[in-house]
């Protein structure tokens, strides 16, 4: 399975950074245009391991429902979510937060994913999806730095 890793530093304390990422409505502010995402529901709320989120995700008129489960959550340290149904066959996203220099925070992401189908075509689609994710993280890092200045 392909893996995308990303790491960025923001000039904000870890409790503030975790609180920002712990609020699923903030995900929309981290998506590069023209992608759009909107939270439809959380059950149960507030977010905790086992919570299921439904989002509406897409580009322009091409939209679909994306259902995600929160697998693990350690306040001010980490959380893990995985896709139950949506644009990928597998999407397992680990978010880790570590204290950084000058009171800032390191944000580390690891995404294990598979778009499908299997075989050569799937490998090509996964490679393209990996590239899109890497570019998304580049945009997201710049956005995080602006939103989380501490």
Q: Where do the protein language model's features map onto the residues?
A:
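Beta-strand elements of well-folded, non-transmembrane domains
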Residues: 10-12, 59-61, 72, 87, ...
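Generic structural detector for well-ordered beta-strands
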Residues: 7-11, 56, 69, 96-98, ...
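Secondary-structure boundary/capping motif
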Residues: 1, 92-95, 137-144
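Glycine-rich portal/gate segments that line the openings of hydrophobic small-molecule binding cavities
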Residues: 39-85, 106, 139-142, 147-150
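Short, surface-exposed coil-to-beta transition loops
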Residues: 3-5, 63-67, 89-93
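Hydrophobic ligand-binding cavity/cleft-lining segments
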Residues: 1-48
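Beta-strand/loop substructures that line and gate deep hydrophobic ligand-binding cavities in soluble
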Residues: 80-135
């Amino acid at each position: 399975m392909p893996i995308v890793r990303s790491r960025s530093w923001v000039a904000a304390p870890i409790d503030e950074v975790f609180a920002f990422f712990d609020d699923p409505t903030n995900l929309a502010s981290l998506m590069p245009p023209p992608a759009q995402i909107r939270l439809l529901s959380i059950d149960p709320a507030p977010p905790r391991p086992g919570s299921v989120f439904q989002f509406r995700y897409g580009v322009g008129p091409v939209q679909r429902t994306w259902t995600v489960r929160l697998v693990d959550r350690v306040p001010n340290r980490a959380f893990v979510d995985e896709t139950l149904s949506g644009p990928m066959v597998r999407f397992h996203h680990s978010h880790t937060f570590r204290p950084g220099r000058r009171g800032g925070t390191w944000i580390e992401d690891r995404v294990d994913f598979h778009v499908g189908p299997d075989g050569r075509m799937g490998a090509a689609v996964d490679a393209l999806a990996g590239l899109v994710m890497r570019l998304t993280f580049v945009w997201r890092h710049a956005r995080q730095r602006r939103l989380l200045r501490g």
